[in-house]
């Protein structure tokens, strides 16, 4: 991703993670998704600061450590479209401190994208690039119910199609090693994302945090994480069936440093990335190796 962003913006680009004090409709109704912790799966240590202060402090650090000169304002925690439009406009605007912010990335649920929000994001497209990150996790409806996602596949498809009509860049989040999924579910997820024409994918590995429903299930022995070998098999299959035009934003998760019951089989992020790359090379395969365009890829010869 870093090389892709460098080519796109002709500069070193760094992502600034923002906690804008939003919440989530699930938490107000039936409770959070089972994997979500009290921070809304966001780990910004600066969440007590204003949005502007979060941006400025992170930017200063990234400029010194990475020599970054351009930045993505990434609204990560909870559902970042779940508020009145006027509130959203104010908080998004606060992140655009100056011209060094080249992209606004908004992470949310597919059932929290009403038309007025898409129209608001249209407004921001005149100032910066805008990407909409939508959590799908899996194409398997039974697994979605176990995860307590509170939406189905149809809502995700609807959100993607409407966002694309507005010319928005769409990034999908998936978890490839869900214990309730099979290999076929992972492959079908890759195919669906490809046919929908999403622009990017963030692939996550399942981790278990203490203060979450999943954490309680883990301690009770209600499920077993899949093995690393199975994770690797699913990751390779997902990549093979994914359109080569889709940008891979990540290959594994970044779990919190404390309060984690299970994460990445005790491996570092780079060990997992290296293992995936090594396995791709060993099998002489690549992203899109088994991808077939919609309609079976048959040319119309009439």
Regions found by a protein language model. Give the residues of each.
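Core AdoMet radical
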Residues: 39-58, 66-85, 100-113, 129-155, ...
């Amino acid at each position: 991703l870093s090389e892709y962003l460098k080519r796109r913006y002709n500069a070193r680009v760094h992502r600034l993670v923002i906690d804008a004090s939003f919440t989530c409709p699930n938490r107000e109704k039936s409770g959070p998704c089972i994997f979500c912790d009290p921070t809304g799966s966001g780990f910004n240590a600066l969440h007590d600061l204003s949005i502007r202060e979060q941006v400025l402090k992170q930017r200063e650090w990234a400029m010194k450590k990475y020599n970054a000169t351009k930045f993505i304002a990434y609204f990560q925690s909870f559902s970042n479209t779940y508020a009145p439009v006027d509130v959203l406009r104010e908080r998004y605007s606060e992140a655009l401190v100056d011209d060094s912010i080249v992209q606004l990335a908004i992470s949310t649920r597919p059932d929290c994208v009403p038309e007025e929000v898409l129209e608001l994001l249209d407004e921001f497209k005149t100032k910066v690039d805008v990407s909409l990150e939508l959590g799908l996790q899996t194409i398997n409806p039974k697994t979605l119910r176990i995860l307590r996602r509170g939406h189905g596949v149809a809502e995700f498809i609807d959100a993607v199609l409407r966002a694309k009509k507005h010319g928005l860049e769409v990034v999908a989040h998936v978890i490839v090693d869900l214990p309730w999924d099979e290999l076929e579910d992972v492959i079908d997820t890759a195919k669906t994302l490809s046919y929908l024409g999403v622009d990017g994918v963030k692939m996550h590995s399942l981790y278990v945090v203490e203060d979450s429903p999943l954490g309680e299930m883990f301690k009770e022995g209600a499920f077993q994480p899949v093995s690393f070998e199975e994770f690797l098999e699913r990751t390779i299959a997902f990549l093979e069936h994914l359109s080569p035009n889709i940008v891979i934003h990540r290959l594994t998760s970044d779990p919190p440093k404390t309060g984690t019951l299970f994460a990445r089989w005790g491996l570092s992020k780079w060990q997992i990335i290296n293992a995936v790359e090594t396995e791709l090379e060993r099998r002489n395969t690549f992203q899109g190796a088994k991808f077939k365009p919609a309609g079976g890829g048959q040319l119309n010869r009439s």
